[in-house]
Amino acid sequence: LDETQATLLNAGRYHASHGLLRIELRHQLRDSGHGVREDLLEAVLTVRNASDRPQRVEIGFGTSLRPGGAGGAQQVYLPLSAAGLFGDGRFAALGVRGFLKDCNQPVAAGEFACHYLEPMASQPAERETRALLLAPVVDVFDSRQPWRVALFTPSDEPARFSAVTRTPLFGGPGGADKAGQTTWRASRCVTVAAGSAHTQRCWLLLHEGDAAVAWRAFQQFAHREEFDVPGWVREMKVHYYDFLSSAEGGEGRRGDGYEGDLPRFREFRVGLATQHGYYPAIGDFIQPDRKTWQAMRGDKRGAAAMSFGKMRARIQATRAAGAKAAIYMHAALFDDAAPCFDRLRECVQVDASGQRMDFGWTGPDTAGKTWRASLGSAEWRAHLLQQAGWIMDILRPDAIVMDETFAGLGYDHHAGRTGPTSAGAIDFYRRLRALVRSFGADKAFFTSDCSMSPFVLWADGECGDHAYPGLLGQALYTQAPVRYLAALGGKPWRPCAWHFQQMWPAQMKLARQVGAGVGVSNGWLEYTGLTRLPAETKAAMLADIQTLFDARG
């Protein structure tokens, strides 16, 4: 808003009117639990609309508090999406080519802006950002000073954070201060319905230490955890992922690789085993009346026969081997060879030019062309929830692993649902977790954010495949404090890794650094599985895996 249209409130002026809007600001000091009493200030702004029509309002919280005083060199540590590390084209609509990579950024004269969730979700006129955040937290510091200032907002609401620095024409006393005044602001636009009210919160934290301190405060005060993470999820360290592999390796016919690796589960201390590639067409994973089917219909060696019986037998054998069993789903991939595609074709996401968005995946599990379905579509969300319900009811696994959950970030230009998709995605992941948990308190739902989105906030942990040179292989990916921990919090990180041998040193580095697990796999990119590993490689891996359990003890 133009400053002439703004209504400013502070500790001395805590209520006001703006036309037919009634505005009230309340502050409360809190103890974040980090050893400094009353180090957290919570601000609550309530806007009441007394008019007879909806009102669009921009709500912002600002502070000129800065570490190090007016003459300090200000920096900010941001939990940036890792999509910028390799320019992931799936984030093109958000401006991925210009994404910042280093979480540590200087704050210079002018405006520095960053966004949590899609920019348009907090500021309707903005489409792209240079800094896409994994959590709505900015941590401001001066490297010469111990104290930091952090701003954060609720986990399920979009936010735009900005710093405006104005350099004065003249310095301070003696000409020493020419750094100018910096104001940090957290804001978003909301529509307040006629006769209703909207409440917005923001927190200001003073702390020592690094940004991880602010992230923990965010998790404690600005995020509501709806379920406890099952104990077994924290205990397991090794995640096995099977892409309906072959027991004969890369040149064999798919379908029996899982059974070939099962006898090695105890030896490798596998704690979770995920079945992937089992479906006839991605997006149409399971149907109650389809008890047998052909999977991997795009594989050059021929399709693989699958059935409920085979999947259940794998689940039982996995448990007998001391592991938990998970079933794969995907948040957005939709194969137009699926019988349900014609009924659900309007669920496909539409880009800014009005074209349906293809996902660009062609693999052994595809029978037709793959499209990007939209989590902004209520019909698609209902379809996936129904699929998940059938999986849990018919197969009775211990968990569902949802692939590429970051597909929930973006814009859908389909008529009738135009706008950001993250609100629908958050609602969907919340409902999916609740559905899975309805089958037992020990059932779990895992995301695959791959450090590119924040949806693990509404899951039991992260199982995404990040074992690529462009992600896990980048030094900035594990820059301390590791960016994804802002969203992950204290939940388990148990990745998938198709490049599990190639990326093993990087996997172990992260595991030792932050307590993550490691991934082993079969059926994609590497085809040895657990059974055909070279003896020297196997021995080294087993020794490394043992250290993960030794460290835990």
Predicted regions and their residues:
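Hydrophobic faces of well-ordered beta-strands that scaffold small-molecule active sites
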Residues: 236-241, 273-275, 325-328, 400-402, ...
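Aromatic- and acidic-residue-enriched carbohydrate-binding clefts of CAZyme catalytic domains
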Residues: 278-308, 339-375, 406-427, 432
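An acidic-aromatic substrate-binding cleft motif
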Residues: 201, 205-287, 291
